[in-house]
């Protein structure tokens, strides 16, 4: 039985009152047929039609009264349907949207980029379908979501934690034949899940983004075009499993769940099985803190433990500071991989933001540092341009597994690299 919350009770009573008032207004003929839609840039605007074949306002030709659809004569009744019935919306409650990200980068390192250098390419052609689970008065509600991606980010977004057949080079789910298209391009399905909620408790099951870290998979969720070393090398991107989110109070959420390791798609690899959980809390009106941990059999990298901690401080209306820490200990690495990232973002105006990112990433006893500076320019509400410059260096020389250096395939000692990148994102 759902716990009764007196505040929710008041909302329910208020909702009933609002419904009765709306009903009385409808009798008086004062009805607005168009609902306001939140976040309209991600929702298709649709025109609804009655099944007589005409828009309601012009249904006089179908035998309806010419003063609109407040009533019909005998000529309007077709197949048991009438023009004054409720409109049918096949996308009722479903949000459809996405984005297209095109980018250029002067250098591609062994650790921190996808695609080809010095080429303008499609990084993410992204579309999603989502029905948000919206609970009313503590009742359980169902929802679902699917995300589908094509581009040079595809190979870094699919279920690359799945086992691959040594002969064919293909695996399960979005590693099957047909998903890889050549020239660095591939399809991916980073999310495909169902969820249920009663307002305080949300259960998500399927394939979904990780809770780890600060930067995210979709380009629209990050200030910078390039990613931090920690995201690409110390964190999972996705999981398959079940995770529960419990709202403890208005200021705190707790997460707990089971996953089939890291970056797997609806299969286990080497009996992968791990815990994923943590919490997020508002320390004050301006500061939030999130701690996420996972441990167990991660699959491709064996048994391990990882955690990430993110402190987000909204200093004022324009200035935001973020501190992010990662720790990974896994059998495959045989050592601790640690990272600290710091972000400082200043909003010059509603259309222009400037930001900086400082990184320290340490793996196998060798440290890598990076400084990134960039802009977010919005000439239109659905267009974002992100130019940036990034400087990477490793005093001791960062060596990849194949013996090459991580920067421009250069020399081992005293490595450094400067990268210029820019992308443009169109949202719909």
Model-predicted regions and their roles:
Residues 101-105, 147-151, 208-210, 257-261, ...:
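Outer-membrane beta-barrel pore domains and translocons
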Residues 104-110, 135, 152-158, 211-215, ...:
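Gram-negative outer-membrane beta-barrel proteins
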Residues 1-16:
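Bacterial Sec-dependent N-terminal signal peptides
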Residues 94, 135-138, 200-203, 251-256, ...:
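Repeated loop/turn-to-beta-strand initiation elements of outer-membrane beta-barrel proteins
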Residues 251-253, 270-365, 369-370:
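Detector for outer-membrane/organellar transmembrane beta-barrel domains
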Residues 29-203, 244-246, 312, 345, ...:
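Beta-barrel outer-membrane channel/assembly domains of diderm bacteria
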Residues 107-117, 155-193, 197-280, 290-295:
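Surface-exposed coil loops of outer-membrane beta-barrel proteins
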Residues 92, 116-125, 185-190, 236-240, ...:
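Residues that define the transmembrane beta-barrel architecture of outer-membrane proteins
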């Amino acid at each position: 039985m759902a716990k009764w919350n007196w505040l929710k009770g008041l909302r329910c009573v208020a909702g009933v009152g609002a419904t009765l008032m709306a009903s009385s207004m409808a009798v008086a003929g004062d009805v607005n047929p168009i609902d306001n839609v939140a976040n309209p840039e991600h929702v298709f605007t649709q025109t609804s039609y009655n099944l007589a074949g005409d828009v309601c306002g012009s249904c006089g030709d179908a035998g309806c009264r010419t003063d609109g659809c407040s009533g019909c004569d005998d000529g309007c009744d077709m197949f048991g349907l009438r023009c004054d019935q409720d409109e049918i919306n096949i996308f009722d409650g479903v949000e459809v949207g996405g984005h297209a990200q095109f980018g250029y980068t002067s250098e591609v390192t062994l650790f921190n980029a996808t695609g080809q250098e010095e080429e303008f390419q499609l990084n993410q052609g992204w579309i999603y379908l989502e029905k948000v689970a919206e609970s009313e008065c503590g009742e359980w509600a169902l929802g679902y979501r699917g995300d589908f991606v094509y581009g040079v980010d595809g190979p870094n977004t699919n279920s690359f934690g799945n086992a691959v057949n040594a002969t064919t080079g293909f695996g399960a789910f979005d590693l099957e034949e047909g998903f890889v298209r050549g020239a660095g391009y591939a399809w991916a399905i980073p999310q495909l899940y169902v969820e249920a909620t009663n307002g305080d408790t949300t259960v998500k099951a399927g394939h979904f983004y990780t809770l780890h870290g600060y930067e995210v998979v979709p380009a629209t969720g990050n200030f910078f075009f390039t990613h931090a070393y920690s995201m690409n090398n110390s964190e999972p991107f996705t999981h398959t499993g079940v995770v529960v989110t419990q709202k403890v109070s208005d200021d705190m959420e707790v997460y707990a769940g089971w996953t089939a390791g890291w970056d797997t798609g609806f299969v286990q690899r080497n009996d992968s099985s791990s815990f994923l959980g943590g919490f997020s809390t508002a320390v004050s009106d301006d500061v939030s803190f999130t701690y996420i941990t996972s441990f167990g059999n991660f699959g491709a990298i064996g048994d391990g433990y990882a955690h990430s901690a993110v402190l987000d401080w909204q200093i004022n209306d324009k200035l935001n500071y973020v501190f992010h820490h990662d720790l990974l200990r896994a059998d495959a690495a045989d050592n601790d991989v640690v990272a600290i990232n710091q972000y400082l973002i200043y909003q010059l105006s509603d259309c222009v933001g400037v930001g900086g990112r400082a990184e320290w990433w340490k793996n196998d006893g060798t440290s890598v540092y990076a400084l990134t500076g960039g802009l977010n320019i919005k000439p239109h509400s659905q267009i974002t341009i992100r130019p940036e410059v990034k400087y990477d260096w490793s005093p001791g020389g960062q060596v990849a597994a194949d013996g090459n250096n991580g920067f421009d395939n250069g020399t081992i000692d005293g490595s450094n690299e400067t990268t210029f990148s820019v992308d443009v994102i169109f949202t719909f």
